Amino acid sequence: MPIHTVLGPIDAADLDRTSMHEHLLSDLRIWAKTPTELPPEGVPMGPELMAYLRWNFLSIPENIVLHDPAVAAEELAHVVSAGGSGVVELTLDGMGRRLAELPEISRRSGVHVMVGAGFYVEPTMPDDVRTADVDTLTDRLLTQLREGIDGTGIRPALLGEIGTSYPVTDAEWRSLRAAARAGAETGATVYTHQSFRGMAGTEVLEVLVEEGMSPDRVIIGHLDEYWDQAYHRDIAQAGAVLAYDTFGSDFYYGGADLRNPTDAERLHMVEWLLSE
């Protein structure tokens, strides 16, 4: 079975180490918040703002936009130098996806780029997705998997990141069920987005399996944002893949009670998981 990249299908043997959750070009200004603390005056976006952004991650809209293909290609060069060969770009509609520019980024960087299909959390869904029934959404996903996305000819390598909030909304449940049905029919993996606000991963996995997905074809994402050993153990024992995929996001979501773990804490999670 070939692996679909933005430059066409490749054999699995041609793909080495792969970063499974990346965003190369995206626009998440939908999440921007009015700052409670103004940024330092006259300081441009860059490392000098790191301390401010750690506490005010969503307060500068420019901070949540990845807009430059040249920068994306340059940063992907680090994948090669680290011994990797591919990345999975999980930016979807409503997140600023720019599919047409990904092939050139892949060529310039020498990195295989694979994309996902599906629908993110409800606030990013267009009306025709938010109100559609499961059958309609399933048909849309099957078309993308088999023919390519939105006339680009680019076929997704998997379904994801399928967005769920906490609690999961009705529209998100329909989206999730559609992804499961499309994945079960085609063999595509489903990669989910879990909210940092709560533990919905076990219920999400149950619904995916109920709709026909094999657990070992399901990736439960962002588990390193919500550290609970029993929660992670339950998902692992059910047969799904655990994604600790938010390394580098050491910041607060607007309050001291909404802090992402540090990378050191994430490494402790990995150490614990390996010991289980």
Where are these regions (language model features)?
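Histidine-centered catalytic micro-motifs
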Residues: 17-26, 87, 194-195, 242
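Active-site gating loops and adjacent loop-to-helix segments of metal-dependent hydrolytic enzymes
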Residues: 23-67, 117-135, 246, 255
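Divalent metal-binding segments
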Residues: 46-73, 90-94, 161-169
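Catalytic domains of carbohydrate-active enzymes, especially glycoside hydrolases
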Residues: 74-88
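Active-site gating/metal-coordination segments in enzymes
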Residues: 85-86, 104-108, 112-189, 241, ...
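Distinct, well-ordered alpha-helical segments
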Residues: 100-103, 128, 169-174, 197-211, ...
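Catalytic beta/alpha-barrel core
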Residues: 189-196, 217-225
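Active-site-adjacent C-terminal substructures of enzyme catalytic domains
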Residues: 226-276
